[in-house]
Amino acid sequence: MSIATTIVKNTPIFGRMFAVAKSTGLEEINAWPALMIMSSFVWLVVAGLLGLVMPATQIFDLSSDHFYTTLTLHGAALTFPFSFQLMMGVGLHRSGGCVGKAITGWLPALTWLTMNLGAAILTVAVLMGLKVSVIVMFPLPLVGAQMGVWSMESVIVGFTGIYLVLFCMIFCYPLLVLK
């Protein structure tokens, strides 16, 4: 049993939805893509809950700071770990199934880890005060740090998370498809 199968199997609720069948002999093709797809739906639930919190911050007249924190967390969770990871998992599942090559080894593990670790690090940066809109990028991260809107540490932590996600998508994923 692979590490990916074990993680999927031991995950409450989602583990049963994305269970990897070992009896078919396709575990090597399905395990890592199933873990990536399952992880993307976990992030979707997180993003959905944050999406419900956004109007609540306005209804209860909380600080606009809370609204922008929630907005940034919601956008980052939908963009990076949900959308990118879902595309990656489905793509690897199809490429493994069509070509018949196993998706095993250190590269799929690195891909899954960098995607989720990068998203978690970006989440920490937002909680540290980085509140950049994913779409508009206003104010620019360095300008916001120079103006005192957020700290330079949150910018560094945020870009570290974004770097890990982009490394996963630009470098690791194409290597997995070509492998």
Residue ranges and their predicted role:
Residues M1-K179:
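Hydrophobic alpha-helical transmembrane segments of multi-pass integral membrane proteins
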